[in-house]
Design a protein with these regions (language model features):
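Conserved phosphotransfer microenvironments
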Residues: 65-82
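Conserved acidic carboxylate
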Residues: 21
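Two-component/phosphorelay signaling modules centered on CheY-like receiver
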Residues: 24-49
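His-Asp phosphorelay/catalytic-motif detector in bacterial-type signaling
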Residues: 60-62, 87-92
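As written
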Residues: 75, 107-115
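C-terminal output helix
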Residues: 103, 120-131
Length: 141
């Protein structure tokens, strides 16, 4: 019993990936990619920006996979919002969108988003990049 307690205490803390996506099919696809390649990462789902804000107020988040077109707002604007808050500015964000636009790329870059990826091109390599991302995102002026 004591050995089990010691092992539990010494275990590496679990990372949490917040997936902000309103499409159930895309949620399941991302969850399958995460479960297959990243067993040590807990996946939390949010269907709206309001749900994402509530999650982040309560739980530590290691990375965010963010759709751009959500029922209650724009993912790129949410990335800017997070970049303006010191407690969230260092969280790596990947925008995963059906229709990435030049405007979205510009806004994402200004917020320090590490990748903007078309949903059809999204895969584990982008998650690896986010989990290994060490550089603090730039602050907006």
């Amino acid at each position: 019993m004591q050995a089990q307690i010691a092992t539990t205490r010494a275990a590496k803390p679990t990372k949490t990936c917040l997936v902000v996506e309103d499409n159930i099919f895309d949620q399941e696809r991302i969850k399958r990619i995460m479960d297959k390649s990243f067993q040590g990462v807990f996946v939390a789902m949010a269907s709206t920006l309001e749900d994402a804000r509530a999650h982040m107020a309560r739980y530590q988040t290691s990375m965010i996979l963010l759709d751009n077109n959500l029922p209650d707002g724009n993912g790129a604007n949410f990335a800017v919002e997070l970049a303006e808050k010191p407690e969230f500015a260092g969280i790596p964000i990947i925008i995963v969108s059906d229709w990435p636009t030049p405007f979205m790329f510009d806004k994402a870059q200004s917020a320090g988003v590490i990748h903007v990826v078309n949903k059809s091109d999204f895969g584990a390599r982008y998650i690896h990049a986010a989990l290994n991302h060490k550089v603090k995102r730039p602050r907006l002026n």
